[in-house]
Regions:
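A domain-level signal for the structural core that forms small-molecule/cofactor-binding pockets
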Residues: 1-115
Length: 115
């Protein structure tokens, strides 16, 4: 915990999803939630077959799912989502990539998380 899963479409310019991006996201998670950085785990999934709306121009997306142990306040989860969204938007903008960018923050049940 925390777990970050970054899904993105194959039209994302190469090199955007990197250890540097994950490190930036990890630091945001630590700053906002107080989690131990050594427990942050990130992975990415590229989607080659996708459709956004009815678009035929191949517009893509980035979606970050963040799972943290339950117990954080609504305000903490809102701040976390907003800051991560800002970092992802900045990254996409810097790469010149126009895509839908979303973040979802989910709780992990302490009763059902085993380590």
């Amino acid at each position: 915990m925390p777990h970050l899963t970054l899904e993105y479409t194959a039209d994302l310019p190469r090199g955007v999803v990197s250890r540097q991006l994950f490190a930036r996201l990890h630091h945001i998670v630590v700053e906002v939630t107080g989690a131990d950085i050594e427990n942050c785990k990130s992975r990415s999934i590229e989607h080659g077959n996708f459709l956004v709306g009815e678009s035929s121009d191949g517009a893509g997306f980035v979606h970050l799912e963040v799972r943290i142990l339950e117990g954080r306040t609504r305000d903490v989860k809102t701040e976390l989502g907003r800051r991560l969204l800002g970092a992802l938007r900045d990254t996409c903008d810097s790469a010149g990539w126009d895509a839908q960018v979303t973040v979802e923050v989910r709780d992990i049940s302490r009763d059902h998380y085993f380590k």
